[in-house]
């Protein structure tokens, strides 16, 4: 069963550059983490045509947005589905009250700060420029984050290598606020989309991924037409016959997943055997639960990797898991492509140890 799950999830995640366009890849996996270089590398893995300028172009064309979504992390999502994703995962304003109090913002101060921030974000503005414009506001960025959770402010990426952001008022960028969508209907839609991209999966997987309580996750999945293939693993009914006939993966396929890739973050702890053997989970995930950058061989995690830049040289360290052999020539070309995307003039790979 594990091999079938691995092959199926690899296909449904569109790994191996399975689709032509990054917009299609993004729709098929629902969302990718907004952080850079996670977002561009996640799209590079899944689309045949992706280069350094493509993500910026998608943002300027308003094809994608960066919004608080699953588990209140910031995700890059298709603009067309953003209202439903936002509505399904949005926290009520009272849930942010503690954060505002911690920043010294009562209701009146927050309302005043919102107005000031909106005045300064009619055009994209960097965080540093915003701080200069409102120098007396020590609580500024906390207020901006809560405004994003209200759908009033959006983030824009500026660099593929690092998470350098600009902020812009949603209404100024889109000419309107995000459409209001029904939260429950949106959650039911999200549950069905999740199973199509990440199934077969358990109720606890969807609850963990989405950040909603288990009872709400269960109720949302209860509205979907699914089959239980065993062990509580749910699959859309119309995918069952194709799932049962899926072919094993080529054992020599190679994929480089970035930190927080959609696939590594798609299932709860205890449900990740299709991606990584139980004995290696501690090498594939940080204690906090963050999915680490991984080298996949035949859809199975065999090493962790990290990188840093020295000028324009990209220095890569690959750390194979215990009792896993990964010849350098197996992944060298894949890292060259990552370096090309991130503007490296040279890529140097070294072996690491746990």
Identify the residue ranges that each predicted region occupies.
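Long, low-complexity intrinsically disordered regions
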Residues: 1-264, 268-272, 276-354
